[in-house]
């Protein structure tokens, strides 16, 4: 089914309706040809006349092996799909009055997620009257983002969505996140002058 849909994207040979076409590619003089002459050229080479730009004036065609062309096109699409990295979003939930132990535990998990290349969506859930502490929740999320500044960049600042206040973070590039500050080298004097004791001076 997929090959059929790909085939329908291009007109070939007698399916081409234009009276003249511009041929491009190798082993042929690139110029405008009457359709009958273009078809004859393709037939002589035992190849296909493929319309690759139907909206051009006149339409642009290539003389190629159509089956091979479709195979290369499918292969290229498959390679592009493989290059697309799927990004996971990990959620971390806080309460408006999260204690330090719980906070540090979740902060450690967030660092791990970001180092693995995942995005982090952290939120404070307000239950019942705890919505009165929404400012406290915002402070908590901003602290969370600040503590992760070496690992993440902020995609979305804290925003209230119903009973949730959410912040979204995405990982920084690994070289930025893992870069360690340069350790200063111990100072080594270029030349150390030995001092003689005062009593050893020659008179």
Swiss-Prot record:
One of its GO terms (biological process) is ribosome disassembly. One of its GO terms (cellular component) is membrane. Pfam families: IF3_C, IF3_N. Residues 168-203 are annotated as: Disordered. InterPro entries: T_IF-3_C_sf (IPR036788), T_IF-3_N_sf (IPR036787), Translation_initiation_fac3_CS (IPR019813), Translation_initiation_fac_3 (IPR001288), Translation_initiation_fac_3_C (IPR019815), Translation_initiation_fac_3_N (IPR019814). It is found in: Cytoplasm. Signal peptide: none annotated. Keywords: Cytoplasm, Initiation factor, Protein biosynthesis. GO terms for molecular function: ribosome binding; translation initiation factor activity. PROSITE patterns: IF3. Residues 193-203 have a biased composition (Basic and acidic residues). The keyword Protein biosynthesis applies. Belongs to the IF-3 family. IF-3 binds to the 30S ribosomal subunit and shifts the equilibrium between 70S ribosomes and their 50S and 30S subunits in favor of the free subunits, thus enhancing the availability of 30S subunits on which protein synthesis initiation begins. This is Translation initiation factor IF-3. It comes from Bacteroides fragilis (strain ATCC 25285 / DSM 2151 / CCUG 4856 / JCM 11019 / LMG 10263 / NCTC 9343 / Onslow / VPI 2553 / EN-2). The gene is infC.
